[in-house]
Structure formats: C-alpha cells, structure tokens
Amino acid sequence: MKMKLFLLPVTMLFAVVTPSKAQTESPFDSVQQIKEVVISTTRIPEMKSNAAASVTIIDHNQIAAMAKIAPDMSKLLGLLTPGMALSSNTTSSRSQSLRGRSALILIDGIPQSTPLRSTDRDIRTIDVSAIDHIEVVKGSTALYGNGAIGGLINIITKKDVTGKSIAGQTSLSGSTYNFFRQKRGQGYRLNQQLYGTVGKFDYLVNGAFGRTGSSIDGSGQFISPRYGLGDTYTTNALVKLGYALSPKNRLEFMYNFYRSLQDTKLIPSAGKYLQKPAIGILGNKDPQAVDEGTRYNHNSYLKFTSRELFSHTDFEASIFGSSLYTIFDFRKANPAQPRWEGTSGQSAVKDRKFGFRTQFSSRLIFSDNAFTHLVYGYDYLFNKTAQPLVDGRYWMPWLTSNNHAPFLQTKTTLWQWLNVKFGARYDFINVRVPNYDVLRNKVTDPEVHVAGGSLRYNNVSFNVGVSYNKVAAFQPFVAYSQGFSIFDLGRTLRAAKADVLSKISTAPVKTNNYEIGAYSDINHWLQLSGSFFYTYSKLGSDL
C-alpha cells in the first residue's frame, strides 16, 4: 500500500504597536524568561519546586509552538504533560486520564468538568489562542472540591503585560492533510489580538476562528467523522479587563466564549474487527441529525483583590458563572441494541454553574528564619445539569447541586529552605433529584417511575507535604493528599432500575495519593523532575 501523509502549515504574523518602539517578539514572551514561575493553582502562590507536589507548567512559548501544528487542547496536554494520556484524536477526552484517573479542568479557576453528567469534552472548552499558560497539579486533591481524583488542570487566560497603550497581533495560518485530497483536506485559522494599558485601566481582546479539513489517514482514506476532529468549525472570543482601584486594590473581569461544531459531508461507514476500519464516506446525514459538538461554552468572572487589606493579610473575592451546551453524535435506531424506546435520536448535555470564592491570605512572621502562610476561606458552587435529546425528550432530568466548602491551607517555612504544608477542606454537597420517568430502551420494557429527593455528601479531605530546597540540584519532597468525586451521577440515574432514590447506588469515590519526588536545577541549564506515587480508592472512579 502506498502511504502518503502531508501537513503544510503556513503562518503570517503582523504586529500593531505604538510608534515609539518596534515590536520584535510577542509581548508575552518576556514573562516566560523567568526561570521559575509562581503558580497559583495550589491556592498559596509559590514556586513549583517548593509546592510539595508534582507540578507541570506549560508556558506561553510552548503553547504558541504547538498551536502552529496542532491547535487542539487534547493533543497539547497529552504531549506536554508527563503522566497524562495522549489524545484519542477525537472530540472525546474520556480516555485522556491524568495518572490513570480523571482530572478537574478549570479555566481561570472556573470548573469545566460536569460531575452531574459528564460530557467528556471538558478539555476542549477553550481555544489555544486565548491561553497564557497552563498549570497542572498531579495527584488526588480537593483544593477545588469534587472531581480532581487524578489532579488539577488550570488553564490561565491571557491578559495585557506590555504596559503599552495599544498593541496587537494578527495571525493567519493554513494547513492540508493530504495534497491528493486538497478539496477536502484544507483548513485555516485566523486570530486577532488587541491589548494595552491606559492609565489605571488594562484590557485584552482576543478573537479566533478556524476550520479543520476532513481527516485523512496515511493511505488517503477519510477517517470516520463520528466524534471526529475533521470538518470542525471553531470560534473563540476572550475579553479581559482590569482596573486598579488603588496601588493595592484591583478589579478584574473576564469573559470567554467557545464554540466547536462539526459540519461535514461525510457519514460514518462501520468497520469490522481485524478486517476493515471504520471510515468516512461521502453521503447525506439523516434529516433528523444536527451538527454535533459544543454549541456554546460561556465562562465569566468578576474578581476583586486587595493587598494588605489589614496587617500582613491579602484578600481575594470572585463570583463566576458558566453555561455549556454540547450535542453528541446521532444514533440511528438499532433493534439489536435499542435505546430511547427503540427510536433514533441525538442526546446533549446542558450545564449551568454559578459560584463564588472568598479567601484571606495571612503571613505570620516569627523570625527571619520562620514564618507561616495561611490561606483560609469559603467556596460555593451551584450546578444544574440535564441530558435531553434534541427532539425534546429527557434521558436524564435536571439535577441541581449546592456545594458549600470552608477550607484552610498552611505553609510553614523554616531556615528559608524547609517547607511544611498542611491543608483541610470540608465539602457539603446536596444534590436535588426531581421525580422522573426512566427513558426505556424498548417500549416493551417495564416502566420505571423514580421518586426523587436529595442526595447528600459530606467529605473532609486532608493534604500534607514537606519539601527541602537548600540544594538546587536536589530538591526532594514527600506528600499525601486526598480527593473525592461523584463522577457522572446522572449516568447512574438515567439507567435506574429501582423506583426509590435511596435504593440506587450513588456512593462517591474517595482517593488517597502518596508521593515522593524531587526537582533538580543544575546551573539553570538543565532542569529535571521525577516522582513515585501510589494512589488508592475502595471504589472505581468510572462507569
């Protein structure tokens, strides 16, 4: 078989700057020249080498380089995060675990994961053009509550760092998968950014639009469009505004819109195990089918920060919200494997979140060689999720949850190089389930009417760690942390066999993570890190 595979990226970059100074590099690049970046995902701002945890930082330069050849979040994380599974090259991230377990995905601290009914799309919820850097904290943790049994992935969006009154960038790129399929293999991307600072006000506006060509394998055959990345149109818009109320007080607003839909002339052709693969062929899709993908994902926050609100104490408060609508692939009625009362259909997930976070950060200074950093506060999250069919029927009813959580994180530093960390978080989650009827697989199946009610979860999670940083070439740490998850509760409820909520098994998963590792920095030219971990839970973390 003759194999052919080509990829042709072409990129043009333009810059708009103030007349006083020409711009020779991305304004964000200078930030990445710092040898060690301060991370915030651990809730205590700190260098990753003394965080007593395995942390990976994917900086702006790495993201920009990857975006030229693979502007897809799943591929980027899989290739640049040790311990994370590679992308499946589909829209689904179900198999893309972190240390073998699911991770909690955040955008500027806003949860993208949908625990009441998983979309398996939480990684693909923002375009790479809007991202400044990504912080990955590996291992079970409850720093942000439910869902991080494999770790945390916090996607930090861009903001202006130039100080110029106005600057900008425009990029245009094109690609093709196969020169012999040019009519269907071509794709393109357009990205425009404007940013600047005027007095006390700073701003950044970023817009991106792209289309991928039809996915083609090395032999020139179309890949099946089911859950495919081919023929996908993606739109992203980011707005970030900041205002300095005073030298110590700041107000910041962020809004991000993301859409990714597949519009293809291909239809899937089923394969046969060990004989022929599933492929894509030209054809007309079912008239009942609509374009699959994420129709919208809105994320927004308003944040107030104050340094030295009172003696040696900073304060941060934020309110945030998100709204998501994802549509899955169309399933034609199959008598051998019936669902939805034996009919064709297309399911979706609708998810809405609203929450707030308040935290104080206090420094207790005992001497030059002994001080403690305390972070304490309260988190609240309201979450509402349903899984309807596009035709209006409900496969899973609207579930609502309220999550209240006080927390405390401490970090004590002795002799400037020994760090001892301890943290605790108490989560109280109340999930409200309405009365509902199970959508049967066949009309001849017995009807199941479930009496709704409340599911209550109480969880206390602890973390403790010690790191030693006196010798840059060898900076070891040991750590223990706990996480918990009520992963995909709706999937259990939609297939209920019992008519009373209390008879349905909905136990949460609690994980324990033990870890020993080290960071090494040899004269700033060679940086190494490694760890050994053991994670355990009594219950499985997937269905």
Which role fits each region the language model picked out?
Residues 33-68, 152:
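N-terminal periplasmic "start-of-domain" segments of outer-membrane beta-barrel proteins
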Residues 74-114:
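Extracytoplasmic beta-strand/coil segments of soluble accessory domains associated
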Residues 110-138, 192:
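Short acidic/polar hinge/loop motifs at secondary-structure boundaries
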Residues 128-169:
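A beta-strand signature from Gram-negative outer-membrane beta-barrel systems
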Residues 183-213, 217-265, 362, 366-368, ...:
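Transmembrane beta-barrel wall of Gram-negative outer-membrane proteins
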Residues 212-216, 224, 228-236, 244, ...:
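Flexible loop and strand-edge segments within Gram-negative outer membrane beta-barrel domains
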Residues 261-263, 267-275, 382-386, 428-447, ...:
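Surface-exposed extracellular loop regions of Gram-negative outer-membrane beta-barrel proteins
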Residues 374-471, 486:
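Signature of Gram-negative outer-membrane beta-barrel scaffolds
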